[in-house]
């Protein structure tokens, strides 16, 4: 992740002097994930650093895939916008927002206030803040996102991150099953950290990474309120049907 963050810092300086005009958000990801069973956040992710190129996309493809996810029953759409390692684009947030009616999450390595402003400019309803990337700066970025009318999914991936939950007020909490230091995936990370998160906050809990089918949704549903799924869906020949099967599995946990 160090290499990714180094490039992110360079891009931050490239956009620092730009003027961003916030767009009204208003679609609540927290509310969308608060229903019974396990909800599905479906992700548009052209490339994975661990899996390679998943699918060639342009703006039209991104919009159509987002619509397919929504038809399948996705509660929200995650848009990976990091350009160098994931082949995303910040503009894809706006593309997806105009294509669907469900909440849109901007997923990137947000480490600076200007990126929060950029997210609001493109119409994100929520932004991802990664504890491993920002540490004690998380509360400031979360407050700024709220000031711009956006919700925040705070991502943790280790025990020491639990302390942040007493220092800030995220709308949603995610547990990344991928260790960002080794890139290894272990679904037990959610099963172990999840109950501790539930003791500290009423925010919906999202299991991120590693979902490879409906059976994983059922397993993670022991503690999670939602799953965020990217690679599995990007490889699916019928993304709408793939989401539908995950949603059905989530409903079976009610």
UniProtKB/Swiss-Prot annotation:
Pathway: Amino-acid biosynthesis; L-tryptophan biosynthesis; L-tryptophan from chorismate: step 4/5. GO terms for molecular function: indole-3-glycerol-phosphate synthase activity; phosphoribosylanthranilate isomerase activity. InterPro entries: Aldolase_TIM, Indole-3-glycerol_P_synth, Indole-3-glycerol_P_synth_dom, Indole-3-GlycerolPSynthase_CS, RibuloseP-bd_barrel. Its EC number is 4.1.1.48. PROSITE patterns: IGPS. Keywords: Amino-acid biosynthesis, Aromatic amino acid biosynthesis, Decarboxylase, Lyase, Tryptophan biosynthesis. One of its GO terms (biological process) is L-tryptophan biosynthetic process. Pfam families: IGPS. It catalyses: 1-(2-carboxyphenylamino)-1-deoxy-D-ribulose 5-phosphate + H(+) = (1S,2R)-1-C-(indol-3-yl)glycerol 3-phosphate + CO2 + H2O. Belongs to the TrpC family. This is Indole-3-glycerol phosphate synthase. It comes from Methanopyrus kandleri (strain AV19 / DSM 6324 / JCM 9639 / NBRC 100938).
